[in-house]
Amino acid sequence: MGLTYQLIPVLVCLLVCTSHFVHGHKCDITLAEIIKTLNILTTRKNSCMELPVADVFAAPKNTTEKETFCRVGIELRRIYRSHTCLNKFLGGLDRNLNSLASKTCSVNEAKTSTSTLKDLLERLKTIMKEKYSKC
């Protein structure tokens, strides 16, 4: 027996509503995981936290949030691929940021001022907490 014509719009509406709920919930989970990792990293006393990184937040005003997250990911990869400390946390953070970032971006280290890994992570944590409060 086929579906009645009155039932089809109801099912479509339920499908759309469920899809919207799942996507919104994913945002919360990813951001919460990023914030949790950042909390762990920023409380660690580790010499790697003083490593110099490009100040990716000192980008032009027209830089999108996705481009900024992409640039942060590039700096994190540069650190955890060339140093043996904090690889697990930085790698996980990079993977989670990748889901929020644009696929291509560049960091011009010659023109960019430097900061420390700890400063970068602290600023990222502030941004993520603000983003989480709006999600």
From Swiss-Prot:
Keywords: B-cell activation, Cytokine, Disulfide bond, Glycoprotein, Growth factor, Secreted, Signal
Signal peptide: 1-24
Any Gene Ontology CC annotation: extracellular space
Disulfide bonding pattern of the chain: 27-135, 48-85, 70-105
One GO term (biological process): B cell activation
Localisation per UniProt entry: Secreted
Positions annotated as glycosylated: 62
Record-linked Pfam families: IL4
Molecular function terms, GO-annotated: cytokine activity; growth factor activity; interleukin-4 receptor binding
Primary residence: secreted
Family: Belongs to the IL-4/IL-13 family.
Function recorded in the entry: Participates in at least several B-cell activation processes as well as of other cell types. It is a costimulator of DNA-synthesis. It induces the expression of class II MHC molecules on resting B-cells. It enhances both secretion and cell surface expression of IgE and IgG1. It also regulates the expression of the low affinity Fc receptor for IgE (CD23) on both lymphocytes and monocytes. Positively regulates IL31RA expression in macrophages. Stimulates autophagy in dendritic cells by interfering with mTORC1 signaling and through the induction of RUFY4.
UniProt xrefs under PANTHER family: INTERLEUKIN-4
Protein name listed in UniProt: Interleukin-4
Organism of provenance: Bubalus carabanensis
